[in-house]
């Protein structure tokens, strides 16, 4: 049984930890609001960018004139997975959730006989995936020193991916990130970047249903410029979604840690009081017994 001094030290230690987790929760809550606003503001832009690409792609009648970033290499053998996670931990299962989702995708592709390459964005994703797929990780990018994620960070990653594609290092590129839904809900998401998806987007409003568009100089040239920009935009959105998800998960994790610390303090305090009471009772019995002996 621990002594009163040990219990007192443990209570003081847990209280100190509780102060830290409470402060981290408040910091995460403050950052979450800004991160959530940024992520929600980026969604319409990235979605509309995809819609514009889809509309222009429909106007490209000559498949030979379309950019290779849209048409692809004609093969489906080498896959590059860009896995975006956080730089730091203490955010519950946020990082492991994305890594698990990517890991399942890797295993599926390998089972199909595909060649898989991994590009990690964020230290935690690299740390988790290298345990099983160290030989598959060909590129890593850390944003630890970045105080606030900006478009330039996403653009650097996008340009590097395009360089690798131009060098013939892969055929298909898929982006993995966590879409922010709420403080307690972040959904692992996979989005194909290359070849650029020309899937139909939501139907246009009735007032634009019969619109006829003219492209200058021509649709293929516009796509040549727009697709690389779209890749960076989609990566930027993924990074913003990740930041919001990380802050939400961290706030939830620190809230749980603070409450658990409170419960532990109550239990330790109860044990301390009971042991102290027993000790006082024992001392009183000894005093009374001594007095009676006299």
From Swiss-Prot:
Record bears the keyword Repressor: no
Predominant location category: membrane
Similarity field: Belongs to the ATPase gamma chain family.
Record text on subunit structure and interactions: F-type ATPases have 2 components, CF(1) - the catalytic core - and CF(0) - the membrane proton channel. CF(1) has five subunits: alpha(3), beta(3), gamma(1), delta(1), epsilon(1). CF(0) has three main subunits: a, b and c.
Location of the protein in the cell: Cell inner membrane
Function description: Produces ATP from ADP in the presence of a proton gradient across the membrane. The gamma chain is believed to be important in regulating ATPase activity and the flow of protons through the CF(0) complex.
Name recorded for this polypeptide: ATP synthase gamma chain
Record GO terms (molecular function): ATP binding; proton-transporting ATP synthase activity, rotational mechanism
InterPro entries, per the entry: ATP_synth_F1_ATPase_gsu, ATP_synth_F1_gsu, ATP_synth_F1_gsu_CS
PROSITE patterns per record: ATPASE_GAMMA
GO biological process assignments: proton motive force-driven plasma membrane ATP synthesis
Membrane-protein topology: Peripheral membrane protein
Superkingdom per UniProt: Bacteria
Pfam family, one: ATP-synt
Listed transmembrane segments: none
Alphabetically ordered keywords of this record: ATP synthesis, Cell inner membrane, Cell membrane, CF(1), Hydrogen ion transport, Ion transport, Membrane, Transport
Organism: Rhizobium johnstonii (strain DSM 114642 / LMG 32736 / 3841) (Rhizobium leguminosarum bv. viciae)
Any one GO CC term of the record: proton-transporting ATP synthase complex
Keyword Membrane: yes
């Amino acid at each position: 049984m621990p002594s009163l001094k040990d219990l007192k030290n443990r209570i003081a230690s847990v209280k100190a930890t509780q102060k830290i987790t409470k402060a981290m929760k408040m910091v995460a809550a403050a950052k979450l609001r800004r991160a959530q606003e940024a992520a929600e503001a980026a969604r319409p832009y990235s979605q509309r960018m995809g819609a514009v690409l889809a509309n222009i792609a429909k106007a490209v009648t000559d498949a030979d004139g379309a950019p290779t970033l849209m048409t692809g290499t004609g093969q489906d053998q080498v896959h590059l997975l860009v896995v975006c996670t956080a730089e730091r931990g203490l955010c519950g299962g946020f990082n492991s959730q994305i890594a698990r989702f990517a890991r399942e995708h890797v295993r599926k592709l390998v089972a199909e006989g595909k060649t898989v390459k991994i590009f990690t964005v964020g230290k935690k994703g690299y740390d988790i995936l290298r345990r099983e797929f160290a030989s598959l990780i060909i590129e890593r990018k850390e944003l630890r020193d970045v105080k606030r994620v900006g478009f330039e960070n996403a653009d650097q990653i996008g340009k590097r991916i395009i360089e690798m594609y131009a060098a013939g290092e892969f055929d298909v590129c898929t982006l993995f990130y966590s879409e922010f839904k709420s403080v307690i809900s972040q959904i692992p998401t996979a989005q194909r970047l290359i070849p650029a998806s020309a899937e139909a987007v939501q139907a246009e409003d009735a007032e634009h249903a019969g619109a006829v568009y003219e492209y200058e100089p021509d649709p293929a040239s516009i796509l040549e410029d727009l697709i690389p920009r779209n890749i960076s935009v989609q990566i930027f959105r993924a990074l913003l979604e990740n930041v919001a998800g990380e802050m939400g998960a961290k706030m939830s994790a620190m809230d749980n840690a603070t409450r658990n610390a409170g419960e532990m303090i109550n239990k330790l305090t109860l044990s301390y009081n009971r042991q102290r009471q027993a000790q006082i009772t024992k001392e009183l019995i000894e005093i009374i017994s001594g007095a009676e002996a006299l």
